[in-house]
């Protein structure tokens, strides 16, 4: 077992079963990057993104990620997510940039993505409190979710319950990561969840920003057959928002490189460039 939880093995096999970790965490990290050739980019911003129930899935945001990964890598990536998330992606028609997709529950023993050089793992799994509580009952341990203290990555089931949580969440995400590039040639993998074991090395981070309604209205104005130089107040009047709101939204577009910001007098002039503005939003990648 590449991602063992010894307490669970002892429960179902034999209490005398012993576990010995052969490699240190540092050695495992080196093996992961140097021997297996994995390069991980994490795009979750610290969120678990538990997608098993489908409630937290945001197809527009995730679809923007799929599109930008394909653009960055120059090839269509393969995708692993939960069955309910994939169903929503299909309904919202955001899978065009994806080469092939599969859900977590259909990966056991699968080599479908063994030769894929680019992969995405979107969201993590959580089978519900009942799953953790059943393991607790089997082990005769008290297990209770303390959501007053935290949710997502801060969710706490107590000492034993947290071992079960990490087994179904972090370990399942890592197993999904290991589906890609199994032919020894490695892979670039984008992990859209914070649920990874702490020892797993992350080479870069991605930050996803979906444009709000105000920014979309400004994009519409800037793309019309009007001037290519705008003052903040003129944009605000066209869109029907305050100059402060216009300045904030224009600043986001400038930070993304879609327009240029020039200081003139006591205000700013915004210059429309030849860069095509993505109507969905922006994904920015940075080295960790």
Residues of each region from the PLM?
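Interdomain hinge/linker at the junction between the two RecA-like core domains of SF2 helicases
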Residues: 2-59
């Amino acid at each position: 077992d590449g991602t063992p939880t010894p307490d669970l093995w002892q429960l179902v096999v034999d209490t005398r079963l012993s576990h010995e970790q052969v490699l240190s965490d540092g050695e495992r990290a080196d093996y992961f990057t140097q021997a297996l050739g994995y390069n991980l980019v994490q795009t979750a911003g610290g969120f678990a993104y538990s997608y098993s129930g489908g409630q937290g899935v945001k197809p527009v945001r995730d679809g923007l990620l799929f599109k930008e990964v394909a653009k960055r890598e120059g090839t269509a990536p393969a995708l692993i997510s939960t069955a309910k998330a994939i169903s929503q992606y299909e309904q919202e028609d955001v899978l065009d940039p994806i080469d092939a997709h599969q859900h977590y529950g259909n990966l056991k023993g699968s080599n479908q993505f063994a030769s894929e050089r680019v992969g995405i793992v979107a969201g993590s799994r959580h089978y519900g409190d009942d799953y953790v509580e059943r393991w607790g009952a089997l082990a005769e341990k008290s297990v209770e979710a303390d959501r007053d203290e935290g949710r997502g990555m801060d969710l706490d089931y107590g000492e034993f319950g947290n071992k079960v949580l990490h087994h179904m969440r972090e370990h399942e995400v890592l197993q999904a990561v290991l589906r890609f590039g199994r032919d020894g040639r490695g892979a670039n993998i984008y992990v859209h969840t914070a649920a990874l074991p702490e020892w797993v090395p992350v080479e870069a981070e991605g930050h996803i920003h979906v444009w709000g309604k105000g920014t979309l209205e400004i994009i519409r104005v800037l793309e019309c057959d009007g001037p290519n130089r705008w003052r903040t107040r003129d944009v605000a009047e066209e869109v029907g928002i305050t100059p402060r709101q216009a300045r904030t939204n224009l600043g986001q577009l400038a930070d993304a490189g879609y327009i240029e910001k020039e200081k003139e007098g006591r205000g700013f002039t915004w210059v429309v460039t030849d860069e095509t503005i993505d109507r969905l939003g922006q994904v920015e990648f940075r080295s960790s």
